[in-house]
Amino acid sequence: MNRRNFVKQQLAVSAVAALGPLGMYAGSSSRDAQAEKQQAGFNLKYAPHLGMFRHHAGDNPIDQLKFMADQGFTAFEDNGMKHRDKSLQEKMARTMEQNQIEMGVFVAHEISWSKPNLTSGDQDLREKFLKEIKESVEVAKRVNAKWVTVVPGFEDLRLDIQFQTAHVVESLKRAAEILEPHGIVMVLEPLNFMNHPGLFLKESPQAYQICKSVDSPSCKILFDI
């Protein structure tokens, strides 16, 4: 069976993570990679992340990106991109450009998984968040990203949900002011309470309400279902 067709069929049947053996990976020129990518013909812009193909392409991020391109992928996401060395970010950006891979989301700030931050209304925590958003603008420019993930963090059980929402909206409005001039969009990710108990943003309707309140083209929903 053709290796490339095998990847495509397995992705449609189950998930990328369930791919069977693909044989030994051999690098190819950008032109050959693009021709094979077009032949693969995915109908959707699937975006794998680093580590998914390390058993086929090795641990080097650049080799993994080239492998993704050879399999026909045209997008890539990397939650940890913000914390990678600048030189690696630049190399990854060049590799994606050469292989016509679009950079997807990366996480724009430190997510507070267990303590209230944006929900609390604490000014110092808000300024820390905004500083990280400004830093992420530079990263986004470096890697040609247009989307960054934002998670408002842990809920503040001392405050009514409406006060928490007002605090989050105010922080996001200020973040949107930073992002808008650069055409960058923060996408709010609701996370289910089973896997992420205690987080403030749990449901899509809640995210919709917040986005309507922020009222900015730089604030949308990451509808991860």
Locations of regions flagged by a protein language model:
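Active-site groove signature of glycoside hydrolases
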Residues: 140-159, 185-193
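Alpha-helix N-cap and loop-to-helix initiation/capping positions
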Residues: 120-131, 159-170, 195-206
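Amphipathic, soluble alpha/beta structural segments
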Residues: 100, 158-161, 187, 222
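Short amphipathic alpha-helical leader/targeting segments
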Residues: 20-21, 62, 154, 162, ...
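Residues at structural and domain junctions
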Residues: 34, 78, 115, 154, ...
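Acidic/histidine-rich catalytic cores of soluble enzymes
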Residues: 75-76, 169-225
